[in-house]
Swiss-Prot record:
SMART domains: RHOD. The keyword Oxidoreductase applies. It is an enzyme of class 1 (oxidoreductase). The active site is at residue 178. HAMAP family: TrhO (MF_00469). This is tRNA uridine(34) hydroxylase. Coiled coil: none annotated. Residues 124-218 form the Rhodanese domain. One of its GO terms (biological process) is tRNA modification.
Length: 313
């Protein structure tokens, strides 16, 4: 029986002044261990999701932890039957998660970490303002009970949303969460810089909560969007039933895929009447490349979804 693929989400805010020089040895470590996926490195730290065999993931983690700066790198795992990534990349960035506000640095100032087992008690406090820091298409398929949806399409929009809707003098306690912990960690640093006093964030993010909190005690509702070809995971971290529309990025349900407006790789019920002609042509061309690659048994182009392929068969 084939061993399951290990999917590891990892990040750490840590000052890496030599991050440019880290790119090539890190890429080689990924290749040596048979790792697929993308890691982002910047002066503020490292972030990404990768996949491989049990031995491969352990080998990469050992390589990272050999650097004293990354010995306690945050790391969460889930499993799937098919490789969710097709390429191996290390990218140099200005930020490992882009907020776009100069001076916000979780290495210098960050909110209070809340362990998954303590999260329910915190968000049950009526004085706590609970904010989902993810984008609208992620929130649409699952979130915590009572969470506020900022309806952002990019994390860059988060600061403007906070300034427009909340006042540090009125909102004393704020709790935030995101998929793996990185966005809310940076968001907490931003909110502290804006004068909010008590800022909390879920340590390890939604994925760690789903891993550690029994479903019968959970305050999570729905699936959790993930940034690989699984698209979503359920509460037990098994792969969900959603695909993703590669024209608009929106997760599409089984019901969505039964719609006359769903064309794999090209449109879905959420975007079929909103796409520009340029975007539509680009989606059609990409889908043709995917079909050609499949016919030739070649590596899949960017944008390919193996579940979408099997549903078409």
């Amino acid at each position: 029986m084939a061993q399951p693929i290990v999917v590891a989400a990892l990040y750490k805010f840590v000052t890496l002044e030599d991050y440019v020089n880290l790119r090539e040895p890190l890429l080689q470590a990924m290749l040596d261990n048979g790792i697929k996926g993308t890691l982002l490195i910047a002066e503020e730290g490292i972030n990404g999701t990768v996949s491989g065999s049990r031995e491969g993931i352990d080998g990469l983690l050992a390589w990272l932890k050999n650097d004293p700066r990354m010995v306690d790198i945050d790391h969460k795992e889930s499993y799937c039957d098919e490789q969710p990534f097709y390429r191996t990349k290390v990218k140099l960035k200005k930020e490992i998660v882009t907020l776009g506000v100069p001076g916000v640095d979780p290495n210098k100032k960050v909110g209070t970490y809340v362990e998954p087992q303590d999260w329910n008690a915190l968000i049950s406090d009526p004085e706590v303002l609970l904010i989902d820091t993810r984008n609208d298409y992620e929130v649409s398929i699952g979130t915590f009970e009572g969470a506020i949806d900022p309806k952002t399409t990019s994390f860059r929009e988060f600061p403007d949303y906070i300034k427009a809707h909340f006042d540090p003098s009125k909102h004393k306690k704020v709790a935030m969460f995101c998929t793996g912990g990185i966005r809310c960690e940076k968001a907490s640093s931003y909110m502290l810089s804006e004068g909010f006093d008590e800022v909390f964030h879920l340590k390890g993010g939604i994925l760690k909560y789903l891993e550690e909190v029994p479903q019968q005690e959970s305050k999570w509702q729905g699936d959790c969007f993930v940034f690989d070809n699984r698209v979503t995971v359920r509460h037990d971290l098994s792969e969900g039933d959603y695909d993703q529309c590669h024209a608009c990025r929106t997760p599409v349900s089984v019901e969505d895929r039964a719609s006359e407006h769903y064309v794999p790789g090209i449109s879905c019920p959420h975007c079929w009447d909103k796409l520009s002609e340029k975007t539509r042509r680009s989606a059609i061309d990409r889908q043709k490349q995917i079909e050609l690659a499949k016919a030739r048994n070649m590596p899949h182009p960017i944008g390919y979804n193996y579940k979408q392929s099997s549903s078409e068969a």
